[in-house]
Amino acid sequence: MKKIFAMIMTICLMASALCVTTFAEESTDDFVITVSAEKEDGTVVKLEDYTSFEAGWNFAMEKAKDNNYLDNNDYVRIVVDLLTDWEADADGVFGDSDGEGFECSTICIPEKARVMLNMHDYTIDRGLEYHEWDGEVICIYENADVIINKGTIKGGKSFNGAGGIHIKDKANVILIDVHIDGNSVRGDDGAAIAVYDGANLIMNGGSISNNFMRASTTFFDIEVSPYGALYANESTVTLNNVTLSDNYTFDSAAEGVAIYATKSTVAINECIVSGNAVAQEGRYNAKSVIAGYDSKFIITDTDFTNNASDGGDNCYGDSRLFYFEDSRLTMEGGKITQNNPQELLYFEDSDADINKVTITDNASVVIYVDNDSDSEKVNMNECTLNKNASIDNAPDIQVETKGTLAMNNCAIGDTNFEDKGKVEGVGSLFGEGSLTNILVIISLIASGVAIFLVVYYNKKKAAPVAANGATDTEADDEE
């Protein structure tokens, strides 16, 4: 009997151990979020694992917005690690608005929260089929301090303020290798990202791609046009090694299909801008790919290829690669090639310094300057222009007011001017193609000098000729 009882107990203990082990393994596998805290010395303290996105995110945001909790524990910020893809439910809902981490079904980062979200190459997808109010994927509130690492944000469709990430007043946001893909807005701004009122965005690596925008119609049948895959208003944006590609519109009145900035500073460094605002089936051209109003742009070593459309189906009105009004552009290096808007660079009451930029093989007017006076000036220095021809054979260089465009040491080939007299530095040795011209002229002078010296040297070597036509030797023989 004792043996039987012992056997039963052994079996029960083994079964219990197996159940505990199995439960533990299943629980670990079911974790979707880990919440930790980063200390001032860089170490990370694990706080909790969660099997529910909603519960884990709410807990993280409660801690992240509590600056007393963070400071008293010497924590710099709360760290959230995604352990799998995060998808909204069938209605596009991420979580209940009763929690700290959600509002109007959107993932929220509260005011003054300090957060790092490590996505580990996973995707956050709202999966909306139609546009709705607050249809963005993530909303970052005022004065928040946020870092997001390595993942994809997609599936947002909003009527108000951003499809992907909505960044509110004075928030500081750093995105590292983050891809904002396949989001949209209707009648509002920032299909991918919208940055507002004193906020600061730094984006290192990653992409803004395949986001779209379309107009909406008000109750009074007034059409409201959308602006920008990336939209900045009174803010600062820095893009380093970012790809902006294949962003598009269903409405030809859209502006800044890739980037639209008003009263902002935008720095674009070593980026690729390609395939934006290209008209094709179901897609239209737009007023501009990059648009700046009362803004400052600093663009360095960035390539612009295959953007915009002019002529053909789904092309209506003017289209530009760059449109600047009351703005300032500094552009250093890079290429502008194989684009097809009506104009590449359009300046209205704006200043620019464009240095060492190659502009070739575009089916467009190269530059159009519409400044009111010569106090606003566009300077092109050591640039290369060649093989640019607009569809309607309009002049490549068009200037409304004399003296508002200067071309210095530029290599210009196969380029025509509406009026060379309005462009400083063109039509003289130090103007059109001056580097090439100077080299050619120097070469010609050098060749002439060389020929003269050779002739002179040969004459010196030749024997002197006597008055009767014989050489001195012949004259001596005759004597």
Predicted regions and their residues:
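N-terminal extracellular ligand-recognition/capping segment immediately after the signal peptide
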Residues: 74-114, 121-128
